[in-house]
């Protein structure tokens, strides 16, 4: 069984440790909120605990240079099943080349919406 310990003191810094009982070892993770993701997560009611659970147990998809962590109903571990409605359908988007959280939200059709996105993020330039 995994034990997750939230070590973050700064609202823009998400630090947590995962202790694996079988291995008797811990791994430390560090993610950084952008000002946008911090603002949106507080507006959408996605707190740090929900973000940590989605990052640890969610399915990961790489598209458009971003990592999408989707925590579906079946991904929630047994010891959190009594809080299933609190955690399910949480999506955390992380930059593909760093540990920066771009945004987070909740969506019932998250996997479908991510699959429909194009492979690359299109950037339009304003030409004079």
Question: What kind of region is each of these model predictions?
Answer:
Residues 1-128:
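Ribonuclease/tRNase effector modules and their secretory precursors
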